[in-house]
Amino acid sequence: MFQKRPWITLLAFTALGFALTQGILFSRWGMNVGLLAAAGVLLWRAWGGGPRRRGAWWWLLPAACYGAAMALWEQPMLSPLLLLGMVMALGLWALDGIHAGGPWEQVRPFFPFGEMEAVASGLRRSARAGRLGRVAMGVGLAVPLLIVAGGLLLSADQAFYDFFEGLTNSLADTLTEVVAKAVLSLLIGVYLCCFYLQAEREKTPALRPQREGDPVVLGVMLGLYCGLYLLFLVISCRVLPEMLRPGGAPELYSGYARQGFFQLCAAAVLNLAVFLGVRRQRCAGRGFTRGAQTLLAALTLCLIALALTKMLLYIRLYGLTLLRLYTSCMMVALAVLFLALMVSLYRPLPMLRLGAVLAACTLAVVGLMNAGSLVAQTNVDRYLAGDLQEMDLTQYTDFPDAAAPALCRLLAQTEDPALREEVLTLFEDALSTREHLSWWSDSLQRRQSAALMTQAVEAAGE
């Protein structure tokens, strides 16, 4: 299709890119529908457009869980980036050749930029074949020249500037938004053309052979690397008894918890790169090198456990938030990933498939746990029991519907007039902004919480 009608194909994919940007970036329901559509396309490729994958329909389960979570509950912090991770995981399962080669060979179909030259040559050939295409090419070449020359002329003469001032002021904001969306949609369209052309040609990337690594070099490198982790863990664990002692040094572990997660992410990514790099060497399975990799995985698990301990201590002191809850879930997922890496050193495991399963299941669990309600219920229970000194209500402005049942219980049981006033103000603000919400941001939880908040505000007014 692209060889016969390249411009029509590009325009169609650009329109699809515009629909995707509008739906995914500005609509929760658009995100949901986009995810399910991507899952359907990738599964169709697995079942109809390529070799039949055994058990491929299981990927509909996490997609359905995520869709149900978005329809039932508020999801204030689940961004389109997580959706992209889910779609990538689905694609890794569905694409042909998933079991062959290293990680880069397996994800290479998602980066079809080698087809960029073929797409550009096809567009040029089609444009030169017709008069309308040549006119469009001339307009496209003239646009950047007009922009540059126009800017220079506007600065050179005040009368010329005054002539266009009213037009530019009225169209500046509109053109900025339209141009930004058009450029983004066009880039997505070009990417989809490259992806389509690659699939149409059914290219299979050549697999790179393993390198002949030096076991001494790898052993020394991994030994020094593990020594750094050992030193870090020894120094960090020296203050662990003080942190675990009731009422001891809260400022110490609060500082640890603020920095621990980001340090953990950087260390985990670095360790993952080390694992993938070492496993590309033929000597990776030999005794000393394999033992050093095992030690590195074990030290990484200890680091994750230490960081998770700090986070739990921080939650015990300052309460639970969505970010702290999601951080804890990511720590657990990282621990499972590195445990699988350790096992794969002694027993062959499909690590890419396991990673995709782990990512999809983590997103499904996070979506179905009703995180906002869990955070509010936990904090209210601890505050009413006297385990939490202060009740911070500012975070609930992001998810008032999820927190409404717990806050109604707090409103009925607390005797603090200032806290009651804060809860009522939160409810009134949520009810006032509800009128401006569009239909695609609706959920079952939002409908149920409206009655609770209205009843609480009316009861307080009486």
Predicted segment positions?
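Juxtamembrane membrane-water interface segments of multi-pass membrane proteins
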Residues: M1-W7, W47-A56, V119-V135, D162-F163, ...
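Alpha-helical transmembrane segments and their cytosolic membrane-interface
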Residues: M1-W44, T294-L306, K310
